[in-house]
Each structure stands twice: as C-alpha cells, then as structure tokens.
Regions:
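FIC/Doc superfamily catalytic core
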Residues: 1-192, 196-355
Length: 355
C-alpha cells in the first residue's frame, strides 16, 4: 500500500468522524448487525440485514429462511457481544480463548465428528482432528497434527505484536488485524466456522483500539476469497493486506457519500454545512503547494468560464498527466473538488473553498 493510500485511509476516517456518522443513534448496534449478516452470508446464509435486525431485536424469525441460517446469525451475534466485552480487558489471546470464541460462533450449528484419532465437536470449538481442503479439489490446509502448536505460536506472535503496536498509528492497527485474520484462516484450526471466527478476531482487534471495524460484504466475497488465494499462492501477505485496506477505503467512501446524500434535504440548522466546513479546514493544511495551485486554477476556471480538465492542468503546471491525476485523487478524497459531466467533455469544479 502506498503512502498516498495510507493518507487516503486516514483522511476518510477523519472525515467519517468529523461528519458524526458514528455518533448517530444506535449506529454501533446496526453497524455490528450489518457485519454479522454479511459474514454469515459469505458462508451461505440468505438472512438479510433487515431480517437479522428483526431477529436480534424482536425475536421475529423469517419463514423464508432455514432455522440453520438464523441460528448462524444468532450465534455470531452472541460471539461478537462476548468478544467486544472481553477484548477491552486487553488480556493475552490464548488457544483456549480462541476455542471459547469459536464455540460461541458455532454454538447451535456445529457438528460432532468421529475420526480415527477420536471425536471432537465444532459446537464446542474443539480443534479439528481431520484434514481439510479449500473446496473440492482445492489445496489442503496444514495437517491437523500441526494445528495445536501452530495455533499456540500464532497466539504468541499476535500478543507480541499487540503489545508493541503503536496505538496512535491507525494504519498499523488495521495491518495487525488483517495479518491476524489471514494467519488464523490459514491455520484453519476448526472443521467449520474458520472464516467467521477469523473475521470476528479481525474486528475485535480493531475495536480493541477504538477503530471502525471493517465490513466484508457478501458482494465482496469473490474479491475477498481471491485475495486469500493469491496471498497463499504467492506467499505474499501484502496482497491480502492491500486488498482489505482498499476494501475498507471503498466502504468508507460509500458510507460518507450515502450520509451526505441523505442529509442534503431538510437540513435547516446548518449542521451538515458546519461539518463539511470543518472537514475542509482540517484537510486544507495537508495540501501540497501544487495541489493548492490546482485548486486556485479550478476556481479561476469557473470564474472565467474555462473548462478545467487534466490536460489543461498538465499544460499549465508543466507536469505529466499521471501526476495531475494523483493530485486530483488526493483532492477528491478531501471532498474539495468534483468531476462534472462526461469523461470526455467534463471538467473539475470546487466543492469547498480552501482558505
């Protein structure tokens, strides 16, 4: 992930905070409900967010969904509630604790297994005693005999990273959580529930330091799984890390855009305008000299009825178009400019004046 991408992530998180999106009534509850519904959907559940909300808050089940699907959601909700309280104690993460976490994830849907090496229960979070593969004909995960020692080593490394992490470095904490997700799902300690438990652990590590948890939507499933596969095949953790960072950036953008659209009408007290002004003031300090000049040129263009596009700015500043495009992306992330019109004949306009 480039330094620019890191800045984009931080700026979007700041904008999210400045707009007060997470301060809305019951935001955290519904945000977690969304995470749960999509996490189970990735594993085959067809329960929608609305159905999950009715199930969680009112105990209303859907006749369109199987009991198995609905129990998947109720179990994962219980696991999140347990984990969110526990993680704030900042205790070491151990193999026994991961087993207890997995037991909550699979409480009512886990199966009993009988193997040559003994029986075990997914509902109790017990480690697998059989070998598993990634789908029919897919690559096999590590031998089950290696799982206990590998899981213990993972816990030791995770706790070291947690204790040495810079709590003020948001990117570093997200990195840690994505690393933990990948490592746990790669070890694949259980016969079932590995994906849900890995995503849960990822979110808990983020919440431990008050970061906005990352959602993996059902629409992200193909890209998400492909990132896991590519990382494994190339033995390059940066592939998964970058993919998850970009996923979070995309969802932050979408949430911000949706929030702004829903507050465009009926805002008589000026709250939205005040929030946007605060955002503009905060980000203006982080602009480069060239970016400030670009803002001035776009402003002048509007006053002189000149269509300012990438080619125009490239010629004016005597820099290549790729450089201009990076600057424009930077300004767009800060919601200072926007593109108006078609790709070929459109132009840039100012959203907020930089003071």
């Amino acid at each position: 992930m480039t330094q620019q991408d890191k800045e984009v992530l931080i700026n979007l998180l700041n904008q999210y905070k400045d707009l007060g999106i997470s301060e809305q009534i019951d935001f955290q509850k519904f945000y977690i409900y969304s995470i749960i519904a999509h996490s189970t959907a990735i594993e085959g559940s067809t329960v929608t967010e609305v159905e999950a909300q009715l199930l969680f808050d009112e105990g209303i089940t859907s006749s369109k969904r199987t009991m198995q699907e609905q129990m998947m959601n109720l179990d994962l909700k219980a696991a999140y509630e347990y984990g969110m309280k526990w993680i704030q104690q900042h205790e070491p993460i151990t193999v026994d604790w991961l087993i207890s976490l997995a037991a909550k994830v699979m409480n009512h849907t886990g199966s009993e297994y009988n193997t040559m090496d003994g029986s075990f229960s997914a509902a109790r979070g017990e480690l697998r005693k059989l070998n598993v593969s990634a789908g029919l004909g897919g690559p096999s995960y590590m031998s089950y005999q290696k799982v206990p020692s590998r899981l213990a080593a993972f816990c030791d490394e995770l706790n070291k990273r947690r204790s040495s992490a810079d709590k003020t470095d948001l990117y570093a904490i997200y990195y840690l959580s994505f690393w933990a997700h990948y490592e746990l799902v790669t070890i694949h300690p259980w016969a079932d529930g590995n994906g849900r438990t890995a995503r849960l652990l990822m979110n808990l590590l983020q919440m431990e330091y008050d970061l906005l948890p990352v959602r993996v939507l059902k629409e992200d499933k193909i890209a998400y799984i492909q990132a896991l596969v590519d990382t494994r095949n190339n033995e390059d953790i940066s592939i998964f890390i970058d993919s998850m960072m970009q996923l979070h950036i995309e969802h932050l953008r979408n949430d911000i855009d949706k929030f702004l659209k829903t507050t465009e009408e009926g805002d008589s007290d000026g709250t939205k305008e005040t929030a946007q002004n605060n955002v503009a003031e905060n980000v203006a300090e982080k602009l480069t000299d060239r970016q400030r000049i670009i803002v001035e040129l776009v402003t002048q263009g509007a006053a002189q009825n000149v269509a300012v596009n990438t080619k125009y700015l490239s010629e004016k500043l005597n820099v290549n178009r790729k450089t201009i495009q990076r600057d424009m992306a930077h300004l767009q992330e800060r919601r200072l400019i926007q593109w108006v019109g078609s790709d070929k004949t459109g132009h840039w306009e100012i959203i907020k004046e930089v003071k």
